[in-house]
Amino acid sequence: MSPLTSSLLLFSLLTSSLEAIPVLQPSFPPSSPSPAPSPGVRILRAPESIVAPLGDEVVFECETSLQPEGFEWSYRRWPNAANSNGSVGASRFKYLKSGNGKLNVTQETAISRLRVLVRPDTVGEYRCIGWFGPLVVTSTTARLELANTSVKGRQETHLQWRVAPGNSVLWSCGQQVHSNPSASWSYYRNGVEIKPELAATNGNLFLTNVSTASAGKYTCLATNPASGARIEISSSMVLEVLSGRGSQNKAPHLLSGQPTSQAVTIREGSTLLLLCPGVGSPTPTAVWSSPDVVEAIHNKRTRVLNHGLEISNVQGHDTGTYICYLDNGVRPTLEHFINVTVEVPPRITRPPWADLTNEGERMQLECEATGVPAPELYWLLNGESSINDTEAEQLPNGYLVLHSVQKRHAGYVQCFARNRLGEQSAGTLLQVNPKQIQSEPRETGSGGGFGSHRSMKPVNHGQKPTKMIPPSPPNVTRLSDESVMLRWHVPRNDGLLILFFKVQYRMISEGKRKNWQTTNDNIPYGKPKWNSELGKSFTASVTDLKPQRTYRFRILAVYSNNDNKESNTSAKFYLQPGAALEPMPVPELLEIEEYSETAVVLHWRLDSDADEHLITGYYAYYRPSSSAGEYYKATIEGAHARSFQIATLEAATIYEFKLQSFSAVSASEFSALKQGRTQRPRASTTEEPTIQGIGDRDTTSHNQPSHNETVSMSPMLTGTIGGGALLLILLVSAFLCMCRRRSPRGRGQTQNKPRMAELREDFVPLGSCSPNKQRQRTRHIHITLNPLAQQQQQQLDEKNPPGLETDNDMAYFQRQPTYEYDPGLRRMSSSSLRRSQRTLERAGGANSGGNNGGNNNNLNQSSEAGTADGPCMQSSSKPGRVIMKRPRLSSRSENLSSGSLNSVGV
C-alpha cells in the first residue's frame, strides 16, 4: 500500500469507529496502572531477528490473534537507521512490494510470511502491519544482519607459564575476536583438539588441577555458526608444570598476561560463569563474596566451583561486583574483582491509556518502561511515526503530547520501548469525537420530497434558517458471519426534527465500484426529547452480508421538511468469519430488579477468568415475554459496567432479557434468557375533604395537589350540577307519563285504519336471510288495500303472462310480527284468516283437475319450488308471481288489514 493510500485511509477515520461518541469532559487515566482500552486484536508472534550470510534466504513470520483484512510489511536500512545501542534514527520505514525478486509475501489465514534474499541492500529492520478495518496494529521490529567474524587488531601474544601441580589456569584466547553471532571455540594442545572442562567460557580456556600431563602448547580456533567461517587465532600459550619436589611456598599471584579485574556482560536468563585466576604453592582456595548483591553466594541458583562461581538464570538484581579471594596460607592473599552487568530487554511498566477525546483538545499519553540499557521510547499513530505528525510532541521522559487531537489520530496508538536486546510494545484505542459541522441552510420547495437537493435562493423573513444536523458516522461491530450492529448518535441541537433513519451500506472490492444499498426498515427517531445533554443514541442491525468482505456504512436521516442528509461514512469494516475470531466473554444475567412501573435494572457479572480487556461494552436485548417479535436493543458502554437501567417499559408487564458483550471486532454469544417484570401501578389514595373554618384556612400553601390527592370542588358548582341533573330526570319522567296516557286512545282510533308500514315490517325481501334462520316456503303475498286495484291487477297480469320474470324488489318473506295486537282484533283476524285459507284450498282443488289456463294457481308446485336448502333464499331465477282470482271474501276477512283483500299472490 502506498503512503498516499495509507493517508487516505487514516483520513477516513472521521470519528471513533470503535465506540459510541457522545461529547465527554476530558478525563485522565487513574493513578494506578489499569488495563488500557483494547481493540481485541494483537500480535501473537512478532518477527524475530535473524543473522544470516550473504546469498541465504530467510523467512520472517508474523501472526495475529484474528485474521486481518490484510498484511503489509515495512522496511528501513540498518545500521544507518539506528545507532549501535539500538536507538531509533530519523529514517522512515517504507512499505514493501512483493515480487521484485528479492522478497515475497504470502498469507495463510492469520499468518503472514516474508521471504527475503540476503543481500547488502536487504539488510535492515522489518516489521509487519495488520489492517483490521480502521485499526492498524504494528509488530515490533526484527533485524536482518549479516553473519561476520573479525579479529580486533593483529597483536600476537605467546605466553609461557610455569605452575606447580594442582593449580588452576585461566587462558583468555578469544579477547581479540568479534563474531556475529557469537563464535564457537575449539582448543588444541600440541595440535590435538581437546574438550574444555567448562563450556560457554567465551574464548576462555580454564584448566583445573593441572599436572605434568597438562603441559604443552595451547592454541584456539573460532567458528561462526551462521556462515561456518573459521578464524585461527595466532596467539598461543605454553604451559610447563613443575614437579612437586622442587616447588617452594608462594603466595597466590597472577601469571603474566592475566587481568587483575574483569568486566562481564550477560543477558538476563543466561548462565553466568565467573572464573578466579591465580596460582600459588601450595594450591590456593577461592572464597567468593559480593558487597553489592544480597545473598549472592548462598542461594539456589549459585554453585561454587574450584576457582569458579556459576549462577544460573541470571536476573537483573544479580548485577554488581563480585570479589574472589585466593588464600593458601601464605600472605598476602590475592583479591580479584569481577564487575557483572546483567542486560535486561525492555519491559513496559506503564502502558498508554486513552479515553474518549473531543476533537481539538490536548491529550497526553504516558508510557514508562524499564530495561538495561535504558530503553528508548517511540510512538506510532495507526502505524505512522509520531515524529512526522505536526500535532504530536514527544517529551524527554518519553510521554507523547497531542496538542490538538485531530480526526486522523483516531485508531490504535502504540508505544514502543527499545534497546539493543529487543523491543516491546503496548497500545491503546484512541477515540476521537469530531466537532459537529453545521450544514448550510437549504430551502426546499413544495415539490421537494425524499432525496430532494434542489438549491433555491433563501428567503429570509426575519427568522433563522432551519438546519439539518446529520447523525454521527456509525460504529460497526460484528454480530455474526452475516450481520453487524451499527451504533450512532445525534448531538443535541436545535435543528430540524428527524422523523426516521435509513441505513445504507456498500461493499468495497477491487473491481467495479459498488452502489449503496438501502435497508427496508425505517428506524424511528422516537420522541422529540433529548435523553441527556449529549444527545440521543441509536442502534440498528444489518443482515444478509457476506463474510470475508469489506463494507462501509452510513446513516441517512429524514427530516420534518421531507428532505434528507447523510452522515459521514464509517471506516472500512472487514467482516470476519466466526471461526477465525477469539471468543468474547459471555456475561451472566444475575437479577432483573423491579425499579419502577416503567423501568427495570439489569445486573450481571463476568466469569473470574474472563479477559475484560477484550470488551468495549454490552448490548442489552429485551421484549415482552408474550411477544414473538423483534428485540429492542440498548447499548451499554464500558467494560466495567455491571448494571444498567432500561426505561420506557409498560407497567406490570413481564419482559425477557439477554446480554452480549462486544468489541470493535466482534460480539459474544448471548447470555441465557432471564425474565423480569415492571412494578404494578400504585393504587391511588383519596383523602376525604375536610371542612375548615375561615380562621383555619391555610393561606401559605400554594402547591398543586399531587396525582393521588382528591381536589374538592366549590359548593356553587356542585349545587348547579346536582340541580340540573334533577330537573332533567323530572322532564323525562313527565314525557314518559304523557306518552303512556295517550297510547290507549291512539290505539283505539287507529286500529281500523290501514297500517301499511306495520304490514311491510312483517315481511322481509326474498333472497335475504330469514330472521329466525328457518326454512320457509317461497311464498310472497301482495295485499292491495284499494278495492279498485283488482282490475288494475288483472290488467297487469295480462301484460305479464305466466313464465315471464317479474321484478323481485317488492317480494317479501313474512316474519313474526313484532308489535302487539289488540286481543279482540287478534281473535277476529285469526278466524278470518282460517276462513280465507279454506276458501283458497277449495278454489285450488277445483282448478287442479283441469287446465290451469291463464292462472298459474298450482299451489303445490309453488310450495315445492319454494323449499329452500337453507335459511337464505338463493334461487338462480326469480320466482314468478302467482295470482289467484276468487270471489270477494266475507266482511270478516276485511278486518285483516282494515280494508279489502282483493288479491293474494302466492
UniProtKB/Swiss-Prot annotation:
* Cystine pairings recorded for this chain: C62-C128, C173-C220, C276-C324, C367-C415
Q: Where in the cell is it found?
A: Membrane
Membrane topology per the entry is: Single-pass type I membrane protein
Q: Where is this region: Disordered?
A: 427-476, 673-713, 789-906
Query: Which stretches of this protein does UniProt put in the Extracellular compartment?
Result: 21-715
Q: Where does the chain cross the membrane?
A: 716-736
Which protein are we looking at?
Interference hedgehog
Q: From what organism does this protein derive? A: Drosophila persimilis
Report the gene name.
iHog
